[in-house]
Amino acid sequence: MKLTKLQNIIFPSQKRFIPYTRMFYYGEGMEQSADKEYWGIAEYHAVDFAAYFNSFSIKKWMKYTKIDNVKICLTMKGSFKIRISGYYMNRGPFQEEVLSEESFSLDEKQELILDIPEMSDQVTIVGFQIVGYKDCCLYSGYYATEIAETEKREVRLALATTTFKKEDFILPNIQLLKDEILNAEDEMAKNFYVHVIDNGRTLNKEELECDHLWIHPNPNTGGSGGFSRGIIEANLQKEPATHVLLMDDDVIILPESLKRTYRLLTLLKEEYKNHFISGAMLYYERMNEQHEDIGYVHDDGSYGPVKHRLDMQRLDAVVRNEEPWAKRKNQYAGWWYCCIPTTVARLDNLPLPLFVRGDDVEYSLRNHAKFITMNSICVWHMGFTLKFNAAMELYQVHRNSLAIQAASGICQNIDFAERMRKFTRVELLRFNYNSAELLMDAVDDYLKGPAFFEKPNGEQILKEKGAKNEQFEPLSKFKNIPVDLDTVYGDGPRGRKEKFIYRLTFNGLFCPDFMLKKEPAVIAYDWFYAPHRQYLRKKLLAVNPHMQTGAIRTLDKKRGKELLKRYRKTFKEIEQRQKTIRKKYQDRRAYMTSYEFWKKYLGI
């Protein structure tokens, strides 16, 4: 049987990864040679490769694929010892199970093929450690398996990435894909395709296109339109793709993640062939920190990761990430890196036209998706942590939440309308009138029915709603207001009298001005609700502690009363019309997810 490569051993060759070497290996005393031919390990120094990118998730590989053996193949020279170990969690701390140890003395460069021995069923990941003795040189390495060619699946993997004027990201990524995959002389190069959906229509087709890579100018129809176009092109290419990998444009990628995805697909067992491979999103700003590999819709209608944040420089996190986690209701895969078989991603099963936000959630839930995740299959995404965009989070997310629930019958345990009602009330109580309007706009537009979504006006709508975003200035502009950034996310206790007056007067909306305090109170700018801090104030300073910016909010009794009247009318209307409007979305969903619809919508 032929030796088939599963994972390459990789090193932090790019400058951006130098501060994060512990994602690749642990230990000191390893340096790359001047000619970059090998990595030298100093005498009596140990380097451990049981790290995020170089450990092997053996339990998952054995579960999901047809392999029944794994080997470590290392090209080395010199004197050294290799220890192979397995790791697993044991009621808290991780445990190491030493599987083998062997010393070598090689006068010439030589490839070693080491069998990974049998291990206990508890072992989740395996890795290896090299202890250098004399002139120890590591040239390259990989994990492999012996398997018959007839056991492999035919895979044609099409990457579809949607971009909108983000050349700083998309152009380097295109070049990386050409250099590392498309121009390689191997099996994957023949079966890998790239569709760049150019929503901004700013990329030069003639300069960028090559064999197996296409630029598709597209109207700006957001992620939904871009990824729908990508799925369409993957299905219609000369040799139709077996899988389409949806990926954001503003990400940092490692080609090795794509290679591991491809190899995984070629070896999947029959019962897992329709699973989605959900790549993890790590923070661009803190590259060692994993934000999410699978998300879920919480019972309160919010969205978030199944797992808590994990520091992938820590071995315990690397092990824990591959252990089973409690399954949540309404799980989904984010489209920063999501590989879907075209038995699911078909021309008659395209995304809903939501422009942005919620399309990936709806698609996973509509298709009852099951997921495979794995260490090192990931991207780094920027901008998730520092800025709250009200037009996006309050209007777009909530409008789409109502629409996907209505159209696809998902998340029936969640009352999105009630969530929006509560949030609207909170925004009115803290004088954030534009945000209250955005939430009610979301309800109003949802109530217009599916015809509203069938018009390609997403860009214009988001621009109009974006004009309602709060305008922040540096905190230096508010020197007369004392701000403690460490206590912004905090609130004091409230007594019965304070609660009663707060509710009775709607936090000052229905009380005389002499009862209101003139000094502005400092509150958090985003989701955090602090009724005690904002109690009976004329002004509030909403602070973003991450960016050290703020915005003044002022009690406006006239506008507040008008919006309160609209608030009562809006949420009464959705309560009365919900059953009827849901039926309209349900009846129209098949058309809105069809090739016929998307051809017209995209003008192709």
Regions found by a protein language model. Give the residues of each.
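Short, well-formed alpha-helical segments that are part of the catalytic scaffolds
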Residues: 166-185
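Conserved donor nucleotide-binding strand/loop of the catalytic core
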Residues: 207-225
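Active-site donor/metal-binding and catalytic loop motifs
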Residues: 140-149, 374-391
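Conserved donor NDP-sugar-binding/catalytic core segment of glycosyltransferases
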Residues: 256-305
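Short beta-strand-to-loop acidic/aromatic patch adjacent to the donor-nucleotide binding site
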Residues: 239-252
